[in-house]
Amino acid sequence: MNIYRKKNIIKKCFMEFFGTGLVMFFGIGCLAASKLTNANFTQFEISCIWGFGVSIAIYFSSSISGAHLNPAVTIFFWLSSKLNKRKVLPYIISQTLGSFFFTMLTYYLYNNLLISFERNNNVVRGTQESLNLASIFCVYPNYNNSFIYDFIIEIFSTALFILIVLEFNNRNSNYFLYNRSVAPILTGFLVCMINLVINPLNNISLNPARDLGPKILLSLTGWGLFSFTGGNDNILYCFIPIMGPILGANLGGWIHKTLINNS
């Protein structure tokens, strides 16, 4: 029994690793292609690719791991007593590693173009001029906004996302969606729509692993501490893409439980 459980958790962690990685590969790959080649994707196209990537990753991993693909989601399910506490840390580590390794894969696929761009534009990693390149991989809040404003936007965006996704997957009130496997497609559309509406105001992550994995990678490939701060003196901004989604996910989950699914 213990061997079976061990194999089962390994399989689930792999699906979280690979599913989160797929989201990163499609999304960051799109950003890299847009900034380093002549692809010139529009904001709409970039948002759609992120959304489709989320849908594909959910279809891939949901039957085995539940397709959390997001530490904020995992923490919410744990605090809601819907996830065994023994799975929390393995899931979060797997999601972050998936984000890290698939970002690294994308980084090395585009490495020659990245170096060429730096040489042609006299960009030195770890300087303010390198923020544009770093933003291919990482999420940096709009530093022209106040910390409180950016933090609230991140919390609101994630709360909205979780609230709607929970209702998509509510087998009691959305029996058709739940049983016809439409929810992953709608979840991808939701990611696309939130990005289109919110990103012009502030860059959002919705997912701590989406931000932390790439920043760890960049810190090891020449950007150093700049990868975390984005050159901003206010260190608090670093926590927005990590703590914002965690607080937002739990807020959205609480609203859904209290106002919608309280029967």
Curated annotation (Swiss-Prot):
GO-annotated cellular components: plasma membrane
Motif (NPA 2): 207-209
Subcellular locations according to the entry: Cell membrane
Ribonucleoprotein found in the keyword field: no
Superkingdom per UniProt: Bacteria
Keyword Cell membrane: yes
GO molecular function: glycerol channel activity
Stretches in topological domain Extracellular: 37-41, 111-145, 199-202, 221-236
One Pfam family recorded for the sequence: MIP
Lipid bilayer topology: Multi-pass membrane protein
Coiled-coil ranges per UniProt: none
Record's signal peptide: none
Record note on domains: Aquaporins contain two tandem repeats each containing three membrane-spanning domains and a pore-forming loop with the signature motif Asn-Pro-Ala (NPA).
Family: Belongs to the MIP/aquaporin (TC 1.A.8) family.
Protein name per UniProt: Glycerol uptake facilitator protein
